[in-house]
Amino acid sequence: MDDYLKIEKIGEGTYGVVYKGRNKTTGQVVAMKKIRLESEEEGVPSTAVREISLLKELQHPNVVRLLDVLMQESKLYLVFEFLSMDLKKYLDSIPSGQFMDPMLVKSYLYQILEGILFCHCRRVLHRDLKPQNLLIDNKGVIKLADFGLARAFGVPVRVYTHEVVTLWYRAPEVLLGASRYSTPVDVWSIGTIFAELATKKPLFHGDSEIDQLFRIFRTLGTPNNEVWPDVESLPDYKNTFPKWKSGNLASTVKNLDKNGIDLLTKMLIYDPPKRISARQAMTHPYFDDLDKSTLPASNLKI
C-alpha cells in the first residue's frame, strides 16, 4: 500500500469503496477498489486471491487492466487503470430528445464484443456486465471493468451499502436458477446494453427477480420447452407463469436499423446454446460499415 497515495473517494462499487489514487513512483493515476469481504474475521480467502491474481494476465485494449493486488490486514485492494467516465454517466449526460450517434453505438458494441471474446477465450466470464462497469475515455474507447470478480467473490444480492444489485442485465437462465451457465450469460447482458445504447433506456428494468422475468417474457414471449429445451425443469420456472406471446423487439427498440434488430434478436435468444456467440456477433452484417482499423484492438488476433 505504501506505493500508492489515495487522492479521493470516487464511488462505491459492488464490493466496496473505490478511490482515485496515484502510484508514488511512476505518477500513474489509478482506481483502487477496496474489497469488503463478508467474513472479515477470517481475512481474505486464498481462493479469491488466486482467482484475482490470474486476472492480471488479462491484457487487452478493451479490458480495464488490473495492475496490482494488495493486502492490508484483512482487506484486499485491487488497483486498476483509471478511467473517469462510465457508460451510465455518459448515457445520462446526453440531452433529452437526443441519442447516441449510431456509428458510436456500433463502435462501442464491437469493442465490448472484442473485450468479452478475449476473456471468453481465456475461460473467464464476467457475469455482471452493466453500463456502470463499462468505462470510456475521450478517444472513443470503451473498456470492460470488474472482470472475473463475480467468480472470485460471488455476486452479492446487495451492494455493501445495501443498495440492491441490478437485475436488469441478467440472463434468464440465471434468473431461473440454473446452477450451470456459461459464456452466453455475458452475451445476453451485452444485448440488453446494446438496446440501451440505442434508446438510452434500460430494455428490461425489473425491480425484483420475478418482475425482471415477467418484463423479459412480455417482450420476448414466455419460454417453454419448445423454444428452450428443459427450461421447465429449471429450479425457479413455474408452470403458473402467465403465457405471453412473443412481441416485437423493433417496436421496443426504435433507433436500430434492420441489421441492428437482427443482431439484437440473436443476442436475446432464450436457449443459451442457440444464442449468438461474441465471435459470431462480430461478423454480423450490422458491423459491415464500421471502420475497424481505427479501433484499439484492430491489430490483435483472438
Curated annotation (Swiss-Prot):
Q: Which residues form a coiled coil?
A: none
Protein keywords: ATP-binding, Cell cycle, Cell division, Cytoplasm, Cytoskeleton, Kinase, Mitosis, Nucleotide-binding, Nucleus, Phosphoprotein, Serine/threonine-protein kinase, Transferase
Output the superkingdom of the source species: Eukaryota
Q: Which residues carry this modification: Phosphothreonine?
A: 14, 161
Q: How is its activity regulated?
A: Phosphorylation at Thr-14 or Tyr-15 inactivates the enzyme, while phosphorylation at Thr-161 activates it.
Indicate the principal place this protein occupies in or around the cell.
nucleus
Pfam families to which the protein is assigned, alphabetical: Pkinase
Q: Which GO terms describe its biological process?
A: cell division; G2/M transition of mitotic cell cycle; mitotic G2 DNA damage checkpoint signaling
Q: Please give the InterPro entries that the UniProt record associates with this protein.
A: CDK, Kinase-like_dom_sf, Prot_kinase_dom, Protein_kinase_ATP_BS, Ser/Thr_kinase_AS
Which cell locations does it reside in? Nucleus; Cytoplasm, Cytoskeleton, Microtubule organizing center, Centrosome
Question: Modified after translation how?
Answer: Phosphorylation at Tyr-15 by wee1 and wee2 inhibits the protein kinase activity and acts negative regulator of entry into mitosis (G2 to M transition).
Query: In which residues is ATP bound?
Result: 10-18, 33
Catalysed conversion reaction = L-seryl-[protein] + ATP = O-phospho-L-seryl-[protein] + ADP + H(+); L-threonyl-[protein] + ATP = O-phospho-L-threonyl-[protein] + ADP + H(+); [DNA-directed RNA polymerase] + ATP = phospho-[DNA-directed RNA polymerase] + ADP + H(+)
Q: What is its EC number?
A: 2.7.11.22, 2.7.11.23
**Catalytic residues (UniProt):** 128 (proton acceptor)
GO MF term (any one): ATP binding
SUPFAM superfamilies for the chain: Protein kinase-like (PK-like)
Span of domain Protein kinase: 4-287
Task: List, alphabetically, the GO terms of the cellular component aspect.
Answer: centrosome; cytoplasm; nucleus
Q: Which residues are annotated as modified residue Phosphotyrosine in the UniProt record? A: 15
How is this protein organized at the quaternary level?
Forms a stable but non-covalent complex with cyclin B in mature oocytes.
Summarizing the function annotation, the protein's role is: Plays a key role in the control of the eukaryotic cell cycle by modulating the centrosome cycle as well as mitotic onset; promotes G2-M transition via association with multiple interphase cyclins. During G2 and early mitosis, CDC25A/B/C-mediated dephosphorylation activates CDK1/cyclin complexes which phosphorylate several substrates that trigger at least centrosome separation, Golgi dynamics, nuclear envelope breakdown and chromosome condensation.
Family per record: Belongs to the protein kinase superfamily. CMGC Ser/Thr protein kinase family. CDC2/CDKX subfamily.
Protein name listed in UniProt: Cyclin-dependent kinase 1
Q: Record the organism.
A: Carassius auratus
